[in-house]
Amino acid sequence: MVPAQHRPPDRPGDPAHDPGRGRRLGIDVGAARIGVACSDPDAILATPVETVRRDRSGKHLRRLAALAAELEAVEVIVGLPRTLADRIGRSAQDAIELAEALARRVSPTPVRLADERLTTVSAQRSLRQAGVRASEQRAVIDQAAAVAILQSWLDERLAAMAGTQEGSDA
């Protein structure tokens, strides 16, 4: 296994590892809260699900595993917040550790890491543009960031799958 501090983000749409049709779960890991999003069964559109509070007892891991089971997720995508200098900081290490712990709970469902630089900033901007006041953003910002992480993964996956299709049609 690759040491956590050297683990790069995964790439969507790899035919050897893509689970095919089915819902994907997107997760934005924060220090206090975890945003959760889910895709439709065709893996085209990400929508918010809920915000899970973190705690020391691991209840948040149980809830995330329960959501993966309830939603019949075929893949779980955890945001990896690398620095702009492409390094792993404390937040990224936390995301990797949560992904590894969750992977043990949801096996054999794969848990992937997705590059998520600036998704919270992007989510805040989108909420602000939608007219959501700053005081109201806290309740949904984690879910919005999870949607951004998952939607990016889904879009990259579709593009990669289309490229694979074109290559096999030639």
From Swiss-Prot:
UniProt-annotated location(s): Cytoplasm
Q: Which GO terms describe its cellular component?
A: cytosol
Please state what class of enzyme this protein is.
Answer: hydrolase
Q: Residue spans with biased composition (Basic and acidic residues)? A: 7-21
The main location class comes to: cytoplasm
Q: Which GO terms describe its molecular function?
A: nuclease activity
Catalytic activity, EC: 3.1.-.-
Q: Which Pfam families match?
A: RuvX
Which keywords does UniProt give here? Cytoplasm, Hydrolase, Nuclease, Ribosome biogenesis
What is the documented function of this protein? Could be a nuclease involved in processing of the 5'-end of pre-16S rRNA.
Similarity annotation: Belongs to the YqgF nuclease family.
* Additional notes on this entry: Was identified as a high-confidence drug target.
What is this protein's record name?
A: Putative pre-16S rRNA nuclease
